[in-house]
């Protein structure tokens, strides 16, 4: 049996709040299952003691935010939304090796657990699930039964450049859903194709979890918040704003009545004329199926991926 533990940390809430938050840390699947089995009764006992039951509700609404850690304001916005919509909030921190190709950055992906835990405690997160790779893939990631999304979602855009990515995402998300058993899960729209894969997963496989997409959180200069922004040097960080400028140009041309080909060509040229960019794709797609569009027709999404030096960035603009 894997040597695991369950621990907890207590953090005083931010200034202006009287709440003292107790964030529990669970590292093993066995402890998570035990927590999930008793969550309803413990929550109801606490609510009755505080005389705060919600219209006779006898079980908590559990919200779930799956992450790979290295948390930033974009992640915290997901937690904030979960806190507003749910009674109990669970955040997982697991850098999933199954979604990284051999040449990708699994080994150097930022791991900042202590800081992540501090942020989550301040946000009032109830539980952090922090498993090891051995807990999630006891026989190894190459021996697990995998979930492979259908080709239209799996093989285009991100999938064309990261062919194993969505298989890894879908597999670990389904496993986490089965373990946490949330009522609702929150994903950022910044990873738009991933969001559509997860929505298709729960719809096609009848997984009883509501999926909520939360709009992209941006820096003041428009750069989408991402854990990989930490890889950018000072000059690259300044240049990185060009990606959102390119997307915004497509949206501006769409609003002016231009067609997709002209708009994407102009935006692609903008990036090619800037220093250090290698454009991988810039496309206009249907908002749900991600089928490529030749004319702007709502709902649509403008999606792009490009490398700035050695750092790969993705972004999008959603037009509902």
Name each model-derived stretch:
Residues 2-277, 283-291, 317-318:
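Nucleotidyltransferase catalytic core that binds NTPs
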Residues 294-299:
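A short, glycine/Asx- and small/polar-enriched loop/turn
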Residues 301, 305-307, 311-320:
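Generic C-terminus detector
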């Amino acid at each position: 049996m894997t040597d695991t533990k369950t621990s907890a940390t207590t953090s005083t809430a931010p200034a202006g709040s009287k709440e003292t938050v107790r964030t529990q840390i669970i590292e093993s699947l066995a402890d998570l299952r035990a927590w999930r089995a008793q969550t309803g009764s413990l929550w109801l006992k606490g609510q009755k003691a505080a005389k705060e039951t919600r219209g006779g509700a006898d079980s908590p609404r559990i919200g779930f935010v799956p992450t790979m850690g290295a948390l930033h304001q974009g992640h915290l916005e997901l937690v904030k939304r979960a806190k507003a919509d749910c009674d109990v909030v669970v955040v997982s921190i697991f850098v999933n090796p199954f979604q990284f190709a051999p040449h990708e950055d699994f080994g150097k992906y930022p791991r900042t657990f202590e800081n992540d835990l501090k942020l989550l405690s301040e946000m009032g997160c109830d539980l952090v699930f922090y498993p090891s790779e051995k807990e999630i893939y006891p026989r190894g990631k190459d021996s697990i039964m995998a979930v492979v999304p259908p080709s239209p979602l799996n093989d285009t855009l991100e999938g064309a450049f990261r062919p194993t990515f969505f298989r890894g995402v879908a597999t670990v998300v389904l496993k986490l859903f089965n373990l946490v058993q949330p009522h609702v899960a929150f994903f950022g729209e910044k990873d738009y194709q991933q969001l559509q894969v997860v929505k298709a997963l729960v719809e096609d496989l009848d997984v009883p979890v509501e999926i909520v997409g939360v709009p992209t959180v941006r820096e003041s200069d428009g750069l989408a918040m991402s854990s990989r922004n930490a890889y950018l040097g000072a000059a690259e960080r300044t240049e990185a704003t060009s990606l959102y400028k390119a997307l915004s140009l497509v949206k501006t041309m769409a609003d002016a009545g231009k067609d997709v080909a002209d708009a994407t060509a102009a935006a692609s040229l903008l990036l090619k004329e800037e220093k250090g960019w290698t454009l991988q794709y810039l496309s206009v797609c249907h908002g749900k199926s991600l089928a490529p569009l030749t004319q702007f027709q709502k709902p649509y999404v403008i999606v792009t991926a490009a490398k700035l030096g050695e750092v790969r960035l993705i972004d999008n603009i959603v037009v509902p």
